[in-house]
Each structure stands twice: as structure tokens, then as C-alpha cells.
């Protein structure tokens, strides 16, 4: 029986499905839910073209990730579930693992979309694959096509 579930939520189609599955598991088990939205690290003071990093862009991204998280929390609330949530900044796998340890999660739920072609898989990598290797607890990978 799960007591604490951590959902890494990004608002994507696979994230939406993970939210639905997480909702069902939490209802069934009476688990505490925590949602996190992981925002990538800013490029320090340099942009991709070597220019100065735009602080306004960083604030816009923070608002965007906060809106994604709030949408997930609202959907769970509408379904009668209480959940905590936070936006974190950093490497997705490191931040998810850290948060899972911090809240003593016994299940991490993530969405995953199968990518077509080896180049897409190589370029993008797989957070879920790396997470399975590093997670301090069980990981449920919700797959969409």
C-alpha cells in the first residue's frame, strides 16, 4: 500500500495520463499526493547565442511552470483529492529523486511518450529510464503513444 506518492507533472499528454492514473491510485490507497513541476536550469547569464540571459524570459518560464502545476493541483482538487505542489528548478531526474527522498515517497509517477525513431530517442533521452536507475522507491511510468 502506498502512503506517499510523488507525481512529476509537466502538463503534456503523458503527464495528463499520469495524473489520471495517480488519482486512481491515491483514491484506492488513501495516499498523500505531492506534485512537482521541474523547470530546467537557466543558462546562467548566457543565452544559446552567447548573449545576455533575459531575466524576463526566466520569470515568464517560472509563471508557465507554476500555471502547469496549478492546473494539475486544480484537477486533483476537483476530483476530491488534496495535494501539495511546488515548482523546482534543475535537472529533472535529480530534482525528482531529491523530492522523493525529502517527502519519503514510496511511489514516483511519471509520464512517458514513446518517441518515433532512434534519433529522437537519442536527442531527447529518457527521464523515466534514468529515474528508474536512481529513484529511492518504486517508479510507475505511464506510457502514451
Q: Where are these predicted regions, by residue range?
A:
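Short, flexible loop segments at boundaries between secondary-structure elements
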Residues: 137-145
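Structural beta-alpha unit
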Residues: 74-108
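A short acidic, glycine-rich active-site loop
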Residues: 53-67
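Small/aliphatic-rich secondary-structure junction motif
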Residues: 3-52
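Conserved beta-strand positions in the Rossmann-like core of class I SAM-dependent methyltransferases
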Residues: 34, 84, 140
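Glycine-rich, Arg-bearing micro-motifs that act as flexible, cationic patches
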Residues: 110-133
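Short, hinge-like loop/turn segments at secondary-structure boundaries
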Residues: 51-54, 102-104, 126-128
Amino acid at each position: 500500500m502506498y502512503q506517499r506518492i510523488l507525481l512529476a507533472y509537466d502538463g503534456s499528454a503523458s503527464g495528463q495520463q499520469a495524473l489520471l492514473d495517480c488519482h486512481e491510485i491515491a483514491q484506492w490507497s488513501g495516499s498523500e499526493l505531492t506534485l512537482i513541476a521541474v523547470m530546467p536550469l537557466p543558462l546562467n547569464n548566457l543565452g544559446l547565442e552567447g548573449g545576455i540571459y533575459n531575466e524576463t524570459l526566466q520569470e515568464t518560464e517560472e509563471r508557465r511552470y507554476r500555471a502547469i502545476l496549478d492546473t494539475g493541483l486544480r484537477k486533483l482538487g476537483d476530483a476530491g483529492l488534496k495535494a501539495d505542489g511546488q515548482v523546482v528548478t534543475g535537472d529533472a531526474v535529480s530534482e525528482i529523486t531529491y523530492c522523493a527522498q525529502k517527502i519519503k515517497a514510496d511511489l514516483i509517477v511519471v509520464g512517458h511518450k514513446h518517441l518515433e525513431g532512434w534519433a529522437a530517442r537519442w536527442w531527447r533521452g529518457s527521464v523515466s529510464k534514468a529515474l528508474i536507475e536512481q529513484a529511492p522507491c518504486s517508479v510507475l511510468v505511464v506510457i502514451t503513444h
